[in-house]
């Protein structure tokens, strides 16, 4: 424990918290333009073709973002909304593309966890028919 004299000479060091999504610059989401849309493979022990896009954000950063859900309509020059959130098995992917916002379509025929994938609520008759 330091003495008062030691604290006068050198004050306590502030703990700095490093951002997990620096490209967003303290914003909840950022708009960007897709520069490349492609698939990549996850690290061991997983195996798949994960859909990702390289996005140039309005903040000036170029980041790799994950496209969640089954199927997408993104291509080069699509305008997308990017949020934070990493993908554990894809190194370097620290952002997600928001489905159902700007040029990104929501996931078709999605009935569970719809808000996460930009899917509209199905009609009452359509939902009953899908269950049977």
From Swiss-Prot:
The disulfides recorded in the entry are: none
**Biological process according to GO:** translation
Q: Name one GO cellular component term.
A: small ribosomal subunit
Return one GO MF term.
rRNA binding
Among the Pfam families in the record, one is Ribosom_S12_S23
**Sites bearing 3-methylthioaspartic acid, chain numbering:** 89
Q: Which InterPro entries does the entry link to?
A: NA-bd_OB-fold, Ribosomal_uS12, Ribosomal_uS12_bac
Ordered alphabetically, the record's keywords are: Methylation, Ribonucleoprotein, Ribosomal protein, RNA-binding, rRNA-binding, tRNA-binding
This protein's source sits in the domain of life called Bacteria
Q: Which family does it belong to?
A: Belongs to the universal ribosomal protein uS12 family.
Relate the assembly described in the record. Part of the 30S ribosomal subunit. Contacts proteins S8 and S17. May interact with IF1 in the 30S initiation complex.
Q: What does this protein do?
A: With S4 and S5 plays an important role in translational accuracy. Interacts with and stabilizes bases of the 16S rRNA that are involved in tRNA selection in the A site and with the mRNA backbone. Located at the interface of the 30S and 50S subunits, it traverses the body of the 30S subunit contacting proteins on the other side and probably holding the rRNA structure together. The combined cluster of proteins S8, S12 and S17 appears to hold together the shoulder and platform of the 30S subunit.
Can you name this protein? Small ribosomal subunit protein uS12
The protein's gene is named rpsL
């Amino acid at each position: 424990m330091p003495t008062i004299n030691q604290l006068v000479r050198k004050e306590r060091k502030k703990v700095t918290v490093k951002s997990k999504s620096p490209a967003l610059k303290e914003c909840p989401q950022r708009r960007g333009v897709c520069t490349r849309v492609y698939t990549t493979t996850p690290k061991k022990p997983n195996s798949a073709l994960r859909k990702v896009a390289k996005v140039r954000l309005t903040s000036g950063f170029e980041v790799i973002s994950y496209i969640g859900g089954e199927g997408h309509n993104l291509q080069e020059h699509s305008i997308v909304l990017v949020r934070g959130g990493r993908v554990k098995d894809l190194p370097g992917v620290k952002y997600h593309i928001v489905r159902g916002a700007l040029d990104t379509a929501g996931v078709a025929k999605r009935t569970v966890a719809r808000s996460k994938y930009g899917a509209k609520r199905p009609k009452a008759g359509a939902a009953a028919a899908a269950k049977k």
